[in-house]
């Protein structure tokens, strides 16, 4: 934990977690799965003007603007296939299906919590802290990731974009979480990897904030972060784990 921040423990009664790149390594999973999908496209007959390794890198880059996209594979195929204009829909569907299948297989194998997440959640739960998730992911995809990582039972609730209709840093997702907890903002800690969406959004409503540096390596420390987590286990030292919280 950053020794220049949060010198005093944060006395809170609940912890809200972002999901992607905070609890699970979404970017790592997407990179591995994109590589698998690109190789499957080539094996199914795609003709790209670059190598398999380059195809995976390019596909991952085209995923970044919308990590929840369901159409990226067909769009990638039509954009980069040497004879895209001559492809019939059967060929498009076959190659795209191969990509989706390979992507899903890799996704299931690679969707896992960061090291230390489970023991940290166990320690926080045993201490009586209430835990929730506030994510911009759609509900179904959020639960896919949580289930694959074996984490959903740790949380009292999972608030998604499907539920709130707005993405962080809008107030609505955070207010919805506070309403479910029935706690004032200063008794709730928000943990996330994004400066604007997680840290600034939570701080604007008076929540306490801890930035997951491990989920955004190389990014500058957000001004709104009260603490910096080098790894998720730093939460155990950051929050007084009093036995009488319940």
Question: What are the residue ranges of the model-derived segments?
Answer:
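N-terminal helical cap/lid subdomain that shapes the substrate entry/recognition surface
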Residues: 7-115, 140
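Asp-based, Mg2+/Mn2+-dependent phosphohydrolase catalytic module
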Residues: 1-15, 28, 43-44, 87, ...
């Amino acid at each position: 934990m950053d020794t220049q921040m949060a010198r005093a423990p944060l006395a809170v009664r609940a912890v809200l977690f972002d999901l992607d790149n905070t609890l699970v390594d979404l970017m790592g999973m997407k990179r591995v799965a994109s590589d698998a999908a690109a190789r499957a496209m080539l094996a199914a007959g795609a003709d790209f003007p670059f190598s398999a390794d380059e195809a995976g890198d390019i596909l991952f880059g085209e995923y970044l603007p919308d990590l929840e996209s369901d159409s990226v594979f067909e769009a990638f195929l039509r954009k980069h296939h040497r004879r895209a204009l001559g492809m019939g829909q059967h060929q498009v569907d076959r190659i795209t299906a191969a990509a989706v299948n390979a992507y899903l297989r890799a996704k299931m194998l690679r969707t896992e919590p960061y090291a230390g997440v489970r023991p940290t959640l166990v320690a926080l739960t045993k201490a009586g802290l209430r835990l929730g998730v506030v994510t911009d992911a759609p509900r179904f995809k959020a639960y896919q990731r949580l289930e694959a990582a074996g984490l959903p039972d740790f949380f009292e609730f999972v608030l998604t974009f499907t539920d709130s209709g707005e993405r962080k840093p809008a107030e609505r997702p955070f207010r919805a979480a506070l309403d479910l907890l029935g706690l004032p903002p200063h008794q709730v800690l928000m943990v996330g990897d994004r400066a604007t969406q997680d840290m600034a959004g939570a701080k604007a409503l008076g929540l306490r904030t801890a930035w997951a540096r491990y989920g955004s390596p190389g990014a500058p420390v957000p001004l709104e972060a009260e603490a910096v987590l080098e790894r998720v286990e730093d939460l155990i030292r950051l929050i007084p784990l009093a036995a009488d919280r319940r």
